[in-house]
């Protein structure tokens, strides 16, 4: 495996080892660090894993996460998720069981939305006609020029941290048809591998993973 700096090495193979646990086999990290300090630019590392080497992993709700590589370093990876409701859609009229939106820009079929604390999912979008999987308890229609009632797109901000290295992903979706699908976006992570199980429940996706509170 090619590494081009010491941070890349520690991310993939871990940091310095203690004499107590590794004895005379503890010097690889020191050697690689000195290699780059002294002007080295390309270092090839071959990992020899013991039979019992494991990958740090965790599963909560619909989200399964594991470290990108085996080793204890993965135990220090931290992931945080937060619900985001920035994009909004104004529904200006009702049409049968569907609604007419002022604009559907940024919204797709399968997206989770929120209106007055109630979660729903977009079933279909045709032109500006939008239908939802569930019924709203309160009427979401607002014909005003400046709307007071709007439907919000529910997305998730994700932060992946390992020591000083941080990967931030903004406004991700659990909708597989979205260009911001969490599974596709986190596939580019150099710290973790993620698997997402489709969730048919309509609710806050972060609460479905982490619980309320």
Give each language-model segment a name:
Residues 1-213:
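Surface-exposed assembly/interface segments
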